[in-house]
Amino acid sequence: MIVCIAEKPSVARDIADVLGAKTKKDGYIEGNGYQVTWTFGHLCTLKEPHEYTPSWKAWSLSSLPMIPPRFGIKLISDPGIEKQFRIIEGLMQNADEIINCGDAGQEGELIQRWVMQKAGAHCPVKRLWISSLTEEAIREGFSKLKDQKEFQPLYEAGLSRAIGDWVLGMNATRLYTLKYGQNRQILSIGRVQTPTLALIVKRQQEIENFTPQQYWVLATLYRETTFSAIIRKSDEELAQEESDAKENPKKAKKAEGNRGIPPITDLATGQALMERIKNVPFTVTEVAKKQGTEAPPRLFDLTSLQVECNKKFAYSADETLKLIQSLYEKKVTTYPRVDTTFLSDDIYPKCSNILAGLTPYTVFTAPLAGQKLIKSKKVFDNSKVTDHHAIIPTGQSPVNLTEMEKRVFDLVARRFIAVFYPDCKFATTTVIGEADSIEFKATGKQILDPGWRVIFAKPQTNLPEGMTDPDAEARESDEEHSLPAFVKGESGPHLPKLDEKWTQPPRPYTEATLLRAMETAGKLVDNDELRDALKENGIGRPSTRAAIIETLFKRHYIRKERKNLIATPTGIELVGLIREELLKSAELTGIWEKKLREIEKKSYDATTFLNELKQMVSEIVHSVLSDNTNRRVTTIEETATKTATTATVKQPKKKAGTSRKNASSATPAPTIPSDNELVGKSCPLCGKGTIIKGKTAYGCSEWKNGCTYRKPF
């Protein structure tokens, strides 16, 4: 008998249908020589500290660092999990072959490997590796099963990540809680969570410390066209351009003379310039026309989809992940937890059928039918695809979708259709003029051939039912603005003006901009190619970033004001307490992330990684224990009191349907509970669930989602 193990019951049912297994049993489906069973996500987890050494049960500075000589796994304590595991164990003990049908990624590999290890599986194991759950994809996957040994590096990377997070999280959280916490409040520290919080705190401090500088902009109106004075670049701007050119030569700006007037920093200078030119004719000195092309926007990876949904619909990263996961399980989009925007060459022959299946978008797909589809290197590139390709539709018609799912599917579908359309062709016109040797510039843009832009063009009279127009706002900012026909040498009267301006502080992070910052380890990058290069050193993985942001909300380290993410006093104080750069540096944490990726690629040793992490934790413990100051972090209760006091000055009216993030500030922060007050309290480990009472121990209501909190009676 061949045993197939999937990550959830719904996927198991899809696989069983394809394999012809029809007989439903307790915990599995049988038939045609197969037994298809399932997990509920994580069934196993790493052991708790006290399960290695009993003295580690109590939180004590003297027991730190806690580093077991050998890590072990255990079954999560829950009757439902225990029952399902016994079923899996029985099936595997009698199996001739096992097919690992877990989620095709690092976490999915770890989940199933732990279950097989715990069950004592000893027969050959194959791996099903698919990017969608359609019948066609499952059949193709079973025709190309791989040996599980090929995925050993993937497992080692996942195991290293889990152990690394355990070592750092368990030790640093206890260390900072006991050293700097008050009133039993837990100060949660994490390998990804803390640097992410530090990014938000740093941005907030930059805003608070920002001093606005007044300046003036000189412009003039000539033939109903506004020309702005050309401002000479500062040495800092020139140095930044040079640095950017070295990092990304393809996008280097063409070298030009540093022309123009110095920035106008006082009113008198500006008024003098106005007086100087107001009675002098304006003369056109240069008219330059240039044609260019604009490629379609890239296909989505998970992060870019989360960014787009946050910008357009204000969906949180977590909401978007759940929506695209649901679309994947409904078989209308491909595997979502990906970090590439490219497709492999083997997808190209399938694209015509996928387009044909997008029946709500016939108005856009009909012009492509029967034609040879464009195959751009910006879309199809095997070297940019590893485990999975970009998120695309499967070709199955999107039916029975919620309104939120329709919006997300619409984004994915339009991006996919657009990559097979021609580039947008446009012409830009740059006009330079001068008055008394002061140069002014105006630019215009004209769309010659919209190409792929018709997919997003307005008015959207052919929107699929229930679909919105996701790019209306973006299109308005991209609207073409033509200039009148200017001729070099022409001259005439003009009307100068002087506008007062102030320099602006950095903007607070939103979930969209924070996701981008996590992706590039804190570097502000707008260019796709440079962003790709920095992804290797990003903070966290695409599939975990949403959970990290949610954790910061649950820990009361950040809150949301409209779309802006604001650090709470507790979050600010915690980051201020941490002197160890390895704990809060986005760049250094990105290097750790890169090493985990290299383990997956077999170019870095997992043992070396863990030894380095253990050494780092030991150094952090020594450093914190050597701190002789009496610093403490303000408790949530104190923070709430202070906020309430200051908030009485001016309270804006709350709108109906206030964001859950704002409402969540009323929930208690995690604390170190005593045994007699555990049940119903917030889980001290994940902060999401509440403590429940089992047969032999207390646990967390979020155990199905991976929380491993357990406290024996």
Task: List each language-model region with its residue ranges.
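Conserved short loop/turn motifs at secondary-structure junctions
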Residues: 1, 99-104, 183-186, 289-298, ...
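C-terminal helical "lid" subdomain and adjoining coupling/linker elements of P-loop NTPases
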Residues: 179-188, 200-265, 312
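Basic, low-complexity terminal or inter-domain segments flanking catalytic cores
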Residues: 2-3, 81, 118, 173, ...
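Phosphate-interacting basic helix/loop segments used at nucleotide- and nucleic-acid interfaces
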Residues: 71-98, 199-200, 308-309, 411-417, ...
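C-terminal or mid-to-C-terminal helical accessory/interaction module adjacent to the motor/catalytic core
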Residues: 80, 87, 93, 135-222, ...
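Intrinsically disordered, low-complexity regulatory segments
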Residues: 1-166, 170, 261-264, 271, ...
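Metal- or metallocofactor-binding catalytic centers and their adjacent structured scaffolds
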Residues: 247-298, 306
